[in-house]
């Protein structure tokens, strides 16, 4: 908790690289390693309402969060400033519309169900959405058109500098020492979606004179080293893979690629370049991510003042001085009048025509009703709801 309290930025994920060496976890770690702010990591299953309440002034980044109590999502939306890095399709109960169809025999309709609605609301409430590929963003926005309004960026998979440097060394060694021609690699995935059998079959059908080998059971760097010895990589996932690192690594190493359209970053301009151009693009991604966070921290803070009036001229309140005092430091001042008949409303209207930061509204009430005290609170609530600033400053009209 000490790390949490001292942090400016909070990373929330189901697992981190110490727990599992998957592509998502490597991207998360690559971003964490170059954090320009004090940043802590929290497992999604450990997040609770108390932490959210203590972290309202922090900036939160949500990665994979299936393990998080989804009942916390409305609390997060209402109280936190946050961004989401979307690695897959969390609105689907299978996190893959293709797996959904494979398992049920029906097209995915999760976007119409409660899960889809709560996940889309979580995305829509964020300061920024980071996608893995343009195709992924299109699939989301087709099902949830309101997400088009969100600030969003295609981030792609992110690589650490040491990983890119290691891959570059392997590429240079490969150019000098050579590689096994007519020999294709297939990466042994731990998920049906990786399409190992289909990848092997594609090599046999496309290059019948070539051999194919399935690589697995190796550490990350050993796998890259072994991969560099092959002529090409075959990767035919059975469903949409948002931005698979494997094909990026193979391309950086200089291998030929035999891939299908389920590789969803296929066709993006950066991925069509040579190894140096792809590396140049990847080197920019951490900065693109952290610039969004920096823009949040360095944003101008807007402040709205608000108050209420009712026959304040007749009451001889210092109402003009009260409003003027807020205009001295607020970006806008909202005044809700309760139905004045002593000239107050006319004075407010005339003043607002000369002062564009003064926003005046009238909500008439029956002040002779026995609920007049409740009406007073409701007037303040109306005024507050009309404020557009990030922060609000309330004053009674007899205060200066």
Segments from the language model and where they lie:
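N-terminal pre-catalytic "stem/leader" segment of glycosyltransferase-like enzymes
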Residues: 1-67, 71, 92, 258-280
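Short, acidic, metal-binding catalytic loop of nucleotide-sugar glycosyltransferases
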Residues: 321-335, 340
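Conserved catalytic-core segment of nucleotide-activated headgroup transferases in glycan assembly
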Residues: 157-222
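Membrane-proximal helix-turn-helix segments that form the acceptor-binding/catalytic region
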Residues: 105-129, 136-138
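Catalytic binding pocket for nucleotide-activated donors in carbohydrate/polymer assembly enzymes
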Residues: 234-299
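Donor nucleotide-sugar binding/catalytic pocket of nucleotide-sugar-dependent glycosyltransferases
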Residues: 124-172
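Acceptor-binding helix/loop patch of EC 2.4 sugar-transfer enzymes
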Residues: 85-117, 270
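Active-site-proximal specificity loops/subdomain of glycosyltransferases
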Residues: 303-310, 316-321, 341-394
């Amino acid at each position: 908790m000490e790390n949490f309290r001292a942090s400016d930025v909070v990373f929330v994920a189901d697992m981190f690289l110490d727990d599992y060496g998957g592509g998502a976890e490597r991207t998360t770690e690559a971003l964490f390693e170059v954090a320009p702010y004090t940043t802590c990591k929290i497992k999604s299953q450990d997040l609770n309402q108390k932490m959210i309440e203590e972290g309202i002034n922090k900036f939160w980044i949500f990665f994979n969060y299936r393990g998080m109590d989804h009942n916390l999502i409305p609390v997060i939306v209402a109280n936190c400033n946050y961004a989401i890095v979307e690695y897959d399709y969390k609105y689907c109960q299978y996190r893959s519309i293709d797996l959904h169809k494979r398992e049920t025999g029906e097209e995915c309709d999760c976007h119409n169900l409660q899960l889809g609605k709560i996940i889309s609301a979580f995305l829509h409430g964020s300061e920024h959405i980071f996608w893995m590929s343009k195709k992924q963003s299109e699939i989301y926005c087709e099902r949830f058109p309101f997400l088009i309004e969100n600030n969003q960026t295609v981030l792609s998979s992110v690589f650490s500098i040491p990983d890119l440097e290691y891959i570059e060394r392997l590429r240079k060694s490969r150019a000098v020492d050579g590689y096994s021609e007519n020999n294709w690699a297939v990466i042994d995935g731990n998920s049906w979606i990786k399409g190992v059998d289909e990848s092997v079959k594609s090599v046999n059908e496309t290059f019948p004179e070539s051999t194919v080998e399935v690589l697995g059971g190796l550490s990350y760097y050993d796998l890259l080293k072994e991969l560099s010895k092959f002529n090409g990589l075959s990767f035919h996932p059975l469903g949409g893979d948002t931005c698979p690192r494997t094909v990026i690594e193979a391309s950086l190493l200089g291998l030929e690629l035999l891939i299908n359209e389920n590789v969803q970053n296929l066709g993006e301009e950066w991925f069509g370049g040579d190894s140096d151009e792809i590396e140049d693009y990847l080197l920019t991604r951490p900065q693109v991510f952290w610039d969004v966070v920096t823009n949040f921290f360095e944003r101008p803070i807007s402040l709205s003042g608000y108050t209420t009036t009712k026959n304040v001229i007749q009451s001889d309140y210092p109402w003009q001085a009260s409003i003027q005092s807020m205009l001295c430091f607020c970006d806008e001042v909202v005044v809700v009048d309760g139905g004045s008949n002593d000239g107050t409303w006319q004075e407010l209207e005339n003043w607002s025509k000369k002062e564009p930061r003064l926003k005046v509204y009238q909500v008439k009430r029956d002040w002779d009703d026995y609920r007049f005290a409740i009406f007073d609170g409701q007037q303040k609530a109306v005024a507050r709801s009309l404020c557009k600033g990030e922060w609000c400053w309330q004053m009674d009209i007899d205060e200066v």
